């Protein structure tokens, strides 16, 4: 009888993990608990994150009680030209000015926050289990997902790799890599260059 995980060699751990991947009974993955502090993401990202409800817990930075001193907002990759960037920056400056003027005029932060953009930068704590994280990665590593997601999952994978090694990290893949088919084929889904790989 083993009394500690330290009694399991790396080779045995690899063998156990390989067997775990061969079964649809993934309940054992739910015993692995992870907590991430995710900084520098947009509230658009966190609005999507909290839709993943089963197997997740969240604690988000409040904009109701916390005054935003220096507003930072994430500019999406499709804002490319100088004209577009200038319009974006001017708009963000106007919004930030309006927010602080409302606060200075006596408006409570919970009401003044209404003028802030969806892409304002925030932070969120995410607690989950490994099984739920595999599902999250499956959905959000898809090329149809917002690019911000792929970067966050990439960093999560590197943390998993640092603590538990390559096997656990590399198992965090787009759902099509696990199921060998695309699961995003509705009329409202965006085309993906990998669909042709699976849908032949």
Go through each PLM region and give its residues.
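Family-specific signature for flavin-dependent thymidylate synthase
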Residues: 1-200
């Amino acid at each position: 009888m083993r009394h500690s995980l330290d009694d399991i060699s790396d080779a045995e751990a690899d063998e156990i993990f390989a067997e775990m991947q061969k079964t649809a009974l993934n309940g054992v993955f739910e015993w692995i608990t992870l907590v991430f502090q995710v900084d520098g993401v947009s509230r658009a990202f966190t609005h999507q994150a909290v839709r993943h409800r089963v197997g997740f817990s969240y604690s988000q930075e409040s904009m109701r009680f916390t005054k935003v001193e220096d507003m930072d907002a994430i500019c999406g990759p499709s804002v490319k030209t100088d004209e577009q960037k200038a319009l974006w920056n001017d708009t963000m400056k106007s919004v930030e000015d309006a927010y602080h003027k409302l606060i200075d005029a006596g408006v409570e932060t919970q009401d003044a926050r209404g003028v802030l953009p969806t892409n304002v930068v925030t932070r969120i704590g995410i607690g989950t289990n490994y099984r739920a994280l595999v599902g999250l990665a499956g959905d959000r590593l898809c090329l149809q997902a917002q690019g911000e997601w792929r970067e966050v999952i990439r960093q999560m994978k590197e943390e998993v790799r640092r603590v538990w090694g390559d096997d656990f990290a590399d198992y965090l893949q787009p759902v099509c890599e696990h199921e060998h088919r695309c699961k995003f084929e509705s009329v409202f889904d965006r085309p993906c260059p990998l669909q042709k790989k699976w849908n032949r």
